[in-house]
């Protein structure tokens, strides 16, 4: 499949995979890409498959000259689903912001090699952390 920019989707997925354990290929569809990060374990006592994590997820959409994004902070629950939620622990929030910024910088630099920009989606009004310069 070719994206609106003319680049093959499979090539971009391979490049995104090289950024680290962020892309969830099975949740990508058409021109949309899904990334997430399980940054902080809520409680290490349960068995690994029962653990919950604080983290973030980002959706990117390919357009002709840019990728747009939205992201959310929240809880990755025992059922394996994301729930948007307010996180009160300042250290957890700082860790999430750090990992999100790091991913954003890597993704932005990668897309620049394809002469594409990475910008907030036009309808993304809940940007808690400014990522674009």
From Swiss-Prot:
GO terms for biological process: positive regulation of DNA-templated transcription. It is found in: Cytoplasm. Binds to the sigma-S subunit of RNA polymerase, activating expression of sigma-S-regulated genes. Stimulates RNA polymerase holoenzyme formation and may bind to several other sigma factors, such as sigma-70 and sigma-32. GO terms for cellular component: cytoplasm. It comes from Enterobacter sp. (strain 638). InterPro entries: Tscrpt_reg_Crl, Tscrpt_reg_Crl_sf. This is Sigma factor-binding protein Crl. NCBIfam families: PRK10984.1 (NF008217). Keywords: Activator, Coiled coil, Cytoplasm, Transcription, Transcription regulation. Residues 90-113 form a coiled coil. Residues 99-122 are annotated as: Essential for activity. Belongs to the Crl family. Gene3D superfamilies: Sigma factor-binding protein Crl monomer. The keyword Cytoplasm applies. Its main location: cytoplasm. It holds the Pfam family Crl. HAMAP family: Crl.
């Amino acid at each position: 499949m070719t994206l609106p920019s003319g680049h093959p989707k499979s090539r971009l997925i391979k490049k995104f995979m090289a950024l680290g354990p962020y892309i969830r290929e099975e949740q990508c569809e058409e021109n949309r890409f899904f990334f997430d990060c399980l940054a902080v374990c809520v409680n290490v006592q349960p068995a690994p498959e029962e653990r919950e994590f604080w983290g973030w997820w980002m959706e990117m959409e390919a357009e002709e000259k840019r990728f747009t994004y939205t992201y959310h902070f929240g809880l990755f629950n025992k059922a394996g689903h994301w729930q948007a939620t307010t996180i009160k622990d300042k250290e957890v929030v700082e860790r999430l912001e750090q990992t999100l910024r790091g991913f954003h910088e890597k993704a932005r630099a990668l897309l620049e090699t394809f002469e594409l920009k990475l910008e907030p989606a036009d309808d993304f009004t809940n940007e808690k952390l400014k990522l674009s310069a």
